[in-house]
Amino acid sequence: CENIEGLQLRIGIHLGDVIFENNDVFGDSVNIAARLQALAPISAIWISESVHKNISNKQGIISTFVKEENLKNVKEPVNIYEVDINSFHAETAVPVRTPGSAISPSALDKQKKSFPARKVLSIGLPILAIAMAASFFIPSTLKKQHARNDLLPAIDKLVLENFRVPTKAFDMGVEAEKYIAEDSVLIKLWPIISATPKLRTEPEGAEVFWKDYHTPEAEWRSAGTTPLTDVRFPRGYLRLEFRKKGFQTIEYAGSLAAEPMRLDTALIQLDSTSTLPDDMVRMPKSSTHMYLVGLEQHGPKDVDGFLIDRHEVTNEAFGKFIEAGGYTDRSYWKHPFIQNGKEISFEQAVTLFLDKTGRPGPATWEAGTYPDGHTLHPVTGVSWYEADAYATYAGKQLPTVFHWGAVAATWRTEFIVPFSNFSGKGTIPVGSLPGISTFGLYDLAGNAREWCSNESTNAAHRYILGGGWNDPSYAYNDAYFQPAIDRSLTNGFRCIKVLPGDTTIATLLKPVALAFRNYLIEKPVDDKTFDFFLTQFSYDKTPLNEKTDATLDRENWTIEKISFDAGYNNERIELYLYLPKNKKPPYQPVLFFPGSGDLYSKIYNPDGIEGRIDFLLKSGRAIVRPIYKGTHERHDNIKSDLPEATVFYKDHVIMWRKDIGRTLDYLETRTDMQNDKVGYVGWSWGGFMGGIMPAIEKRIKAIVLNVGGMCMTPALPEVDQINFLPRVTQPVLMLNGKHDMYFPVETSQKPMFNLLGTKKPQKKLIIYESGHLVPRTDFAGETLAWFDKYLGPVK
């Protein structure tokens, strides 16, 4: 028992209470023991002061003070002692070493020599048993403590810091589940960091693989074979593949917590490898919203299922069209040619479709062929007429803007664009960058612009979408048309194939009007006209007849549900007033104007602020959340936040103003509000309305607009945002994304900022490398700093 070679242990011991639950043991005592074990040298036994005191009068055990240590997740410092294993050889009790004391070496040597064998067995064997048990118990305990004390807080931090929870949080959850699967905190986190979609394929039996979209070089992870009903996936943006022997592999990009994959009815059709034309992908039937600036007002549109080219048409493929008589066979050319507003003949047109040396072919070619090494580059330098002729030759057609919109996933531009070709240097081989869109289509963003079949309101102009290698990256979000005869060096295309029985194509092929306003040219109305407009927003200060309908208690704040007369249509306004518990009144009230999602909801969720704007409460401010006309329980026939040149829309703007006015009137009846320090936070739609409401309501003293901007659809002049922006004079902070698909930087964000009437030192625009959402920590930090500066710090 005195010499056991090869046994290397280190032991940490603490005396205290522990909790046993579901065959698991945990608590502060376990944590302290585990931390001591981790700190101890090999072959050492480190104990806490509670153990030291317990053994201080025990015969034959000496413990020596080592140091005071701050252990992780332990509130108070811990005094650490080391057990002197040699002391087990002492015959009688010896003084215990304490900080500042010492033992005579001669006395210790004497006691070692006189220690009987039975004492070795009676003390050494129990210690050895403890040590051997610890060698198995402590690693498991450490991992459980690591899961509880390190992984769970790290997951929670990622959740709090990100509007979209990153895959890293999911991976931490998977690791934690190995050791604390039944932990209540982890169980509550799973719905936040993961999704469990019902994935079905026809036929069944496809193996599903996934990886994070942002790490295309990572190894694929298998989730099992379809149907999948209870398998967790990260909630973030993913790359997926559905693989089944004998069938075409389906690539997919998107979040499995969002449509279409989150729908229980989602069914993925697999096609045998010989069924589909080469390099084409099946797209399912969809109701397509148009997330393209200037075309939003045309959605949603029903689009029947169709096939689409996985890649842009290449130089090699276009060369075969030329070899087949593409520029001489008139059967491929179905549409009248228009140049400078006049129709020209086929013979005249083909004289325009020449390469650099005067031979038939794209404008980028030379001597009848494409540049060396560009075989698999997208064909570019072609007119719409040439693209359409090729599609006819191939037995296909150009996509409509609605087909293109159904596959582009422009609402995730900030993910796709970094993996796409907007290099400014030239085209690259198709599919060589991993910036895929929804169903595994490559290069929809950048490389070549892509002609679409629709004409604008002018038959001579056709849409061309996605942007090209020499365009700014935000061109991916913009709807754009140009003369069909244009042969710019970036013009390319891909094709679709309409399936038998399609009932939507006739509607989708119709001309599409583009909404666009050039705010660099448009001018606001003069002051006299604007003063006349203001009169429509006046209202009588009739009694509020306020009533507190409910009080909801939360851990860190209280929610008061209040109602009062709206002052129009005999309606009542519901107000949710959030009051922080960490500060005493009076509070700085922050008025919140939400995004357009509230127009599609019929029930307000009082806890919906968590993870979005609850940082305002944590800062000690109150959140003022009226239910605006047309939203939630006050739902009506307004269907969109887009401005319209209608009396119906104008009436709603007036009602929204009155909702704000009456809300601020109510706040003035309370003594717990600092009504001279009212802030405004507008989110998306609320960011747009932040360019109108503060011009009318001067009780608002400081403004933060989160992803706001100017719209391309006009309203009647008396409620048109452009006429209000110069009259917004309060301090304004604008937080925007470079890849915003609603409010583009150059045509929407910057014009709004420049038109604001606020003095230059008091307005600020920050543009992030993001889409229609800015990083949460930046949103919170910049907002609080802005309010601290212009409303004053919370006291």
Regions found by a protein language model. Give the residues of each.
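Short loop/turn and low-complexity linker motifs enriched in small/turn-promoting residues
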Residues: 138-145, 149-304
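Cap/lid segment of the alpha/beta-hydrolase catalytic domain
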Residues: 596-658
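Catalytic beta-strand-to-alpha-helix segment of the class III nucleotidyl cyclase homology domain
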Residues: 1-84
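N-terminal cap/lid segment of alpha/beta-hydrolase-fold proteins
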Residues: 543-583
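Functional-site microenvironments in short loops/helix caps that host divalent-cation chemistry
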Residues: 283, 328, 335-338, 344-355, ...
